[in-house]
């Protein structure tokens, strides 16, 4: 009982940090509201999510190096402080420049958090239970992702200001910093010295790690793309003009993503990761295919939900396979895998350009996201159940 109590004392503040990690997914809702408020086209508005995920390319590996030197918990706390700062700016200064700064800080904070929080969780959860624990963390993260569009829409309707979401998330960030700071977590020693840039990037020369890296790029590209594009698809197909009437599409995506994470927590603890990964990618493919030619509110939301459900466990399976493949390189692997979230910059950019090229049709965005789906279908044939994980 004492051991269980000690475990829960450590796991709860870590899961609170996963909730704060979910703040990054408000970028889709914020982008669509800012696009409406500032009168931007899709290509210009997609700069905002690109600014969030650009920093994953720049800071992921340095964060892994920093984490090797100061520890995982301290790195997570720094990430939460940067995230809290990003919550302050848009509430007191609101224009295109302030949003670029806000999303940049949110991206930097989330990069620090993504790189350090997963290895911190692995300090208290071991072996084959890691994938299910990472998925549960993603479930908690998805609760924040799911609630953000609803809170923003409610704030827009009640206060005529969707930005009221920021003070709430600021408060949660501060509470998490204090709670985690007071929690003692024993971190395992890995190598005695911090990793270098060359050591981190050299891992990409390993075929298994490269496959996982590209898989995470495609996963997050689909994730961010669906987050931003779902309301636009509803507005285009259903002839809606008010964003408040279509913004719930993002919540539909994250509701199914949340459900998928919750279900995946139990399935991955008991059954084949390979089969579940394949089923997940198949759901994404079916949902994405349906968005090309189907009409009607219910069927479109079903397709969006399929993508959300399928994409909910892709990250956890790929990351856990990579970390278990090289267990003595968890910090470096985590840094490299999180660098793959740079896909959240690449996909929205090309989605915006493709949409513009097709006379502002969201079919352009779907074509770009489908490239990521095709790669994940390929990767599903390579994922293995053994600890060396990928063929």
Label each residue range with its predicted role.
Residues 112-125, 312-326:
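Intracellular juxtamembrane helix-capping segments at the cytosolic ends
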